[in-house]
Amino acid sequence: MIVRSFSDIENTDRHVKSASGTWESKRIVLAKEKVGFSLHETVLYAGTETSMWYANHIEAVLCTEGEAELTNDETGETHWITPGTMYLLDGHERHTMRPKTDFRCVCVFNPPVTGREDHDENGVYPLLTEEA
C-alpha cells in the first residue's frame, strides 16, 4: 500500500512546473509504481493558453476547481469545463485549454508517465519508460 500527500510531493521531483510557465503538476502515482497508470493533480494558471496533443497517451481529466474553455483543435468544438466535469482524450485529440481562473484538475494517464515529461514543441509528452 502506498499513502502519499501533496505535502510529501511539494518541492520534489514529483512537483513539475512547465517550461512554458502555464501549469504545474503534482505527480502522485508514476510509472515506477508499476500499477499501469499515473495520477496527477494539475493546475493551469488563469489567463494562459496551453495547446496539447497526447499522441502517446490516453488522458482522463476531472475538474475539481476553476473554469476553463477546452477546444478540440481538430474540430473547433469548444466545451466549458467546470468543477465536476470530466473529459477523456480517448482519440489522442489535439486540444487547447484556456483557463478563466486557476484551473485545478485530477488527471489519469495511460501509459503512465515517469514524472519527467513536459510538452514538446507540438504539445506532446514523449513516451518515456522507467528502467526495471
Curated annotation (Swiss-Prot):
<protein>
    <recommendedName>
        <fullName>L-ectoine synthase</fullName>
        <ecNumber>4.2.1.108</ecNumber>
    </recommendedName>
</protein>
<comment type="similarity">
    <text>Belongs to the ectoine synthase family.</text>
</comment>
<comment type="pathway">
    <text>Amine and polyamine biosynthesis; ectoine biosynthesis; L-ectoine from L-aspartate 4-semialdehyde: step 3/3.</text>
</comment>
<dbReference type="InterPro" id="IPR010462">
    <property type="entry name" value="Ectoine_synth"/>
</dbReference>
<dbReference type="InterPro" id="IPR014710">
    <property type="entry name" value="RmlC-like_jellyroll"/>
</dbReference>
<comment type="function">
    <text>Catalyzes the circularization of gamma-N-acetyl-alpha,gamma-diaminobutyric acid (ADABA) to ectoine (1,4,5,6-tetrahydro-2-methyl-4-pyrimidine carboxylic acid), which is an excellent osmoprotectant.</text>
</comment>
<dbReference type="GO" id="GO:0019491">
    <property type="term" value="P:ectoine biosynthetic process"/>
</dbReference>
<dbReference type="GO" id="GO:0033990">
    <property type="term" value="F:ectoine synthase activity"/>
</dbReference>
<keyword id="KW-0456">Lyase</keyword>
<dbReference type="InterPro" id="IPR011051">
    <property type="entry name" value="RmlC_Cupin_sf"/>
</dbReference>
<dbReference type="Pfam" id="PF06339">
    <property type="entry name" value="Ectoine_synth"/>
</dbReference>
